[in-house]
Amino acid sequence: MAKAKFERNKPHCNIGTIGHVDHGKTSLTAAITKVLAETGGATFTAYDQIDKAPEEKARGITISTAHVEYETANRHYAHVDCPGHADYVKNMITGAAQMDGAILVVSAADGPMPQTREHILLARQVGVPALVVFLNKCDMVDDPELLELVEMEVRELLSKYDFPGDDIPIVKGSALAALENKDPKLGHDAILELMKAVDAYIPQPERPIDQPFLMPVEDVFSISGRGTVVTGRVERGIVKVGEEIEIVGLRDTQKTIVTGVEMFRKLLDQGQAGDNIGALLRGTKREEVERGQVLCKPGSVKPHTKFKAEAYILTKEEGGRHTPFFTNYRPQFYFRTTDVTGVVHLPEGTEMVMPGDNIAMEVHLIVPIAMEEKLRFAIREGGRTVGAGVVASIIE
């Protein structure tokens, strides 16, 4: 049979499986590819192919992640699955595999377990917009009342972490039944029902080009007779020649006009998400702009110094610290293109943070940075990465 070509004309969405160890995340991932392969929407990927996930580096941290792709009638999906709990923590915090939504896998035989709770909390902290639940191993539970009890527990746990627990779709089934062609109601049909719920409930992400313009400043040049040019890669949105923009971060916000956009030495009318451009700024002096600031649509991003973050601290083996740190720890925080010193305040009751921990903490930077929720950063000591984090919420 000829391999069906993936058509790229469907909207794209990034999702992943999360949940406690051995609750069936990888089996479910395999089962989805098996069931969707029947309609040519996937290539069946067996459990052991997914389980030996390759290692990859993200922000100086090694993470094992398996990627599969498949499509439903409505969407094309890129799906990530991680072999170990630590990989999930690192993946979600670094944003290595960005998730527009996630499938929370809970074993009906065990109910919610510690990592179930931790993954829901992480999803909340790092800003995963929506979750759908797959209650797995339902073929191991004979008592329908017990299933209802587990479902109630899961809904309560989701609500506790500010997800809409009462509204989140929960699909009951068995990934193993789907893989072994047993009990079609719990196997094959449940997988199709799950994908229908994912299609309907996980919102379509806004494409980067449709978001407000933002470009981190990488370099600044002055060109005699023309003015100041700043270079960088447009992170999102579009900037047109003649538009007003703001320069945000490190100092007071300034307004200016983009009088030219060039790429590969050619003049353009506009630059858009993904382009490496030089932007000519009207009336801006070379010393008024620096690396670490951003150019953005006026009013879209504000500079901040205090925020709450979720961070993962590297182990010694990963090249991180050898010793714990305490409150008032002062590393550098690398945002987009530059390091800024900040002071860490640990939560009440947390004495210290050991290498390998993930932790919610408060950070006070010594200078403001253009910042919004979900922004990723690295924690560094003298240029060496010792951790990774994400802005969970802004204080001021």
UniProtKB/Swiss-Prot annotation:
UniProt subcellular location = Cytoplasm
Q: Where is this region: G2?
A: 60-64
According to UniProt, the reaction catalysed is: GTP + H2O = GDP + phosphate + H(+)
Start and end residues of each stretch annotated as G3: 81-84
Residues covered by region (G1) = 19-26
Detail which positions bind GTP.
19-26, 81-85, 136-139
For this UniProt entry, the molecular function terms from Gene Ontology, in alphabetical order, are: GTP binding; GTPase activity; guanosine tetraphosphate binding; translation elongation factor activity
Region entry G5, spans: 174-176
Which sites bind Mg(2+)? T26
CDD domains, per the entry:
EF_Tu, EFTU_II, EFTU_III
Q: Does the keyword Plastid apply?
A: no
Q: Identify the enzyme class.
A: hydrolase
Could you tell me which residues belong to the region G4?
136-139
Q: Any coiled-coil ranges, and where? A: none
Location of the tr-type G domain: 10-206
* Keywords noted in UniProt: Cytoplasm, Elongation factor, GTP-binding, Hydrolase, Magnesium, Metal-binding, Nucleotide-binding, Protein biosynthesis
The EC designation for this entry is 3.6.5.3
Q: Which domain of life is it from?
A: Bacteria
Purpose of the protein: GTP hydrolase that promotes the GTP-dependent binding of aminoacyl-tRNA to the A-site of ribosomes during protein biosynthesis.
Spell out the family assignment given in the record's similarity comment. Belongs to the TRAFAC class translation factor GTPase superfamily. Classic translation factor GTPase family. EF-Tu/EF-1A subfamily.
Q: How does it assemble?
A: Monomer.
Protein name in UniProt = Elongation factor Tu
Organism listed in the record = Rhodopseudomonas palustris (strain BisB18)
Q: Which gene encodes it?
A: tuf
